[in-house]
Amino acid sequence: MKKIILIILIFFTSCKNPNTKNKDHSESDKDIEYVDLIGDFERKDLTKSPYDSWYIENYDNYELDVETAKKIKKLINRKISIKVIMGTWCSDSRDNVPGFFKLMDYLKFSDRRVELIGLDVDKKNPNEDELKYDIINIPTFIFYKNGEEINRIVELTIESIEKDILKILDGSGYENAYYGF
């Protein structure tokens, strides 16, 4: 019953589809046309205007659970890689991706083992990654070990990014918010 209520809540609060182009007013004297990152992109793209207005602030303000991060550090290794499918327009992506990268930095997990893929407001891109990776909501963090998917975090964390990743890596039975649907 709790899962059904959670799913209904998530459904009504999930990423809305805003206009694909809007204005970012973080710069004082001029407006910047906002264009979403679509397809493959690099982490450094998030630190450039106009994305830096939310990425840097959310990265800096994220309070890392160091105790859990230390446990993850013992489990994460070169056999692990991660795909992050997100939308720069999506509030859940804006909230969760910077904290994810703060954790990856703490773990000294190489950016080369994290692949970033952007989707548009319809949760699509020209490469059809939404179909290839069976994306239902974003952000989606897909964890691979030796190239095989082991689990994924979909849209929202169940406990926290650290605790959810720990459960994925230690095999203690992590189920994302959409598991079984």
Residue ranges and their predicted role:
Residues 13-14:
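C-terminal motif of bacterial Sec signal peptides marking the signal peptidase cleavage site
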Residues 143-179:
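Non-catalytic, surface beta->alpha helical segment in thiol-disulfide oxidoreductase systems
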